[in-house]
Design a protein with these regions (language model features):
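Cytosolic regulatory regions built on CNB/CRP/Popeye-like sensor folds
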Residues: 1-166
Length: 168
């Protein structure tokens, strides 16, 4: 992935969208692109929180494992990020994140992300807003007494013309 594509992805993310082009160029130099395939585990619950991930394309599932039970916490799409809480708290990852499709992520190491937060207060403020949003969603789910179910439809875009993977 070229540097201008990384900058464009940063501009479209909630976390970095308010930064100017010079700041985005600086951040893009610290970031690395990694690719995962469907069913790959991107991070495991319990691993050290060494980096922030920004989804460039694809869909991931965030799951928490308690005992032998797996709990789906969220589906994340392009523009979403994960790994922020572990970096801020310097604790192991609180969830396992797996690829549901081919996924490209931008990876920013912990120390680099912390220096970005110190240098760019607007990113820290946006991160606080995003984390507050996550907390409110979590509280709504707990208070409703019901499990919310979200459906994500992933179509195989590489099928032959005229064929479908649904219903056959």
């Amino acid at each position: 992935m070229e540097n201008n594509q990384i900058i464009e992805a940063l501009q479209q993310s909630k976390l970095f969208s308010q930064l100017d082009i010079n700041d985005l160029q600086e951040i893009s130099k610290k970031a690395k692109v990694r690719q995962f395939f469907a069913n790959d585990i991107i991070v495991w619950q319990g691993q050290p929180s060494a980096s922030l991930f920004l989804i460039l394309n694809g869909i991931v599932a965030v799951k928490n494992i308690i005992g032998k039970q797996e709990h789906l916490l969220a589906y994340l799409m392009p523009g979403n990020s994960f790994g922020e809480v572990g970096i801020l708290e310097n604790r192991p990852r609180s969830a396992t994140v797996s690829a549901l499709s081919e996924v490209d992520v931008l990876v920013i190491q912990r120390d680099d992300f912390l220096s970005i937060l110190q240098k760019h207060s607007i990113v820290a403020i946006e991160l606080a807003r995003i984390l507050g949003e996550y907390l409110m969603q979590s509280n709504r789910r707990m208070n409703s007494g019901k499990r919310e179910t979200k459906f994500v439809l992933i179509l195989n875009t590489e099928s032959e013309v005229g064929s479908t993977g649904l219903g056959t």
